[in-house]
Amino acid sequence: MADIYRFPKFSYEDNGTVEPLPLRTGPDKKAIPHIRIVKVGDPPKHGVRYLDLLLLGFFETPKQTASLGSVSDLTEHTGYSICGSGSLPIGVAKYHGSDQELLKACTDLRITVRRTVRAGEMIVYMVDSIGAPLLPWSGRLRQGMIFNANKVALAPQCLPVDKDIRFRVVFVNGTSLGAITIAKIPKTLADLALPNSISVNLLVTLKTGISTEQKGVLPVLDDQGEKKLNFMVHLGLIRRKVGKIYSVEYCKSKIERMRLIFSLGLIGGISFHVQVTGTLSKTFMGQLAWKRAVCFPLMDVNPHMNLVIWAASVEITDVDAVFQPAIPRDFRYYPNVVAKNIGRIRKL
């Protein structure tokens, strides 16, 4: 059983909504490219800004054509068939041009894709034809990039391994960053276990503009019967001296003094941002890696939900602080379904 504190609506009403990508098609029945930019923090209205970019589009393979052996076959355009949808995160850079120039440069990219495997399935991206607006990101684009397949492809099993695959960019998600950075809580701090402590987790409830059931993301019904999605992130631990009694009121007072502000961004798809505008204890500040603004990309928190809703409208409807006893340090974490060193199973 856990105790819950609900944050007031003003803590997320200013930047807690993301508008949908307009899915329109042209005369050729292809999707019309579009760029969507949201602001997190207080970025400058004009001039140089820091932009985080996520390219969205389709994986395509050449269409199969009958081999007739005629001369016209050498010049005939075969076309492409869509075999899946996905994304390419290219990170943060300084940018001073217009949004439309950036969109044009992104859709002009020639991106080849390969499906492979390491410890898990991966997608390899190789990029060519990098235009001038994308030069701030060129260092990363020219090197080639590898991502966890389940984070960047909606259905990686649909990507063939025996055919050439290209990634055609159609949409661009951009997050314009101000004072709020995209600092993440290091995994070692997020997994920290302290005796005699209370874990402060955030339960974030979302409303989306699409139906998610058919894609494997089941909503929950709220008290009014509306369908909502939710996810949880870990903020930190509250620790008291030995012998001191924890109370819900004590935990609530600690959270209220932080004066947290929440917002949504487009980093990795959909991202949840937390900014501390009030007072913060040294213990809690250390757990946040001495940052007063942190980012939780849904791509890392709940990859499948992120894949389903990253082009839809998304709105924060509630944020709750959930106070739970910290997981004891002697509890063992099992990241793999195969247990080590049991019976005939041995670690290599």
From Swiss-Prot:
Post-translational modifications: A large portion is phosphorylated in the cytoplasm, but not in virion. However, this phosphorylation is not essential for virus replication.
Cellular component terms (Gene Ontology): host cell cytoplasm; host cell plasma membrane; membrane; virion component
Gene Ontology biological process: viral budding from plasma membrane; viral budding via host ESCRT complex
Predominant cellular place of this UniProt entry's protein: virion
Keywords associated with the record: Host cell membrane, Host cytoplasm, Host membrane, Host-virus interaction, Membrane, Phosphoprotein, Viral budding, Viral budding via the host ESCRT complexes, Viral matrix protein, Viral release from host cell, Virion
Subcellular localization, as worded in the UniProt entry: Virion; Host cytoplasm; Host cell membrane
Membrane-protein topology: Peripheral membrane protein
Family affiliation: Belongs to the morbillivirus/respirovirus/rubulavirus M protein family.
Domain notes: Late-budding domains (L domains) are short sequence motifs essential for viral particle budding. They recruit proteins of the host ESCRT machinery (Endosomal Sorting Complex Required for Transport) or ESCRT-associated proteins. The matrix protein contains one L domain: a YLDL motif.
Oligomer status and interactors: Homomultimer. Binds to the cytoplasmic regions of F and HN proteins. Interacts with nucleocapsid. Interacts with human alpha-tubulin and beta-tubulin. Interacts with host ANP32B.
Task performed by this protein: Plays a crucial role in virion assembly and budding. Forms a shell at the inner face of the plasma membrane and concentrates the HN and F glycoproteins. Acts as a negative regulator for transcription and replication by sticking to the nucleocapsid. This effect might be regulated by the cytoplasmic interaction with tubulin that dissociates the M protein from the nucleocapsid.
Protein known as: Matrix protein
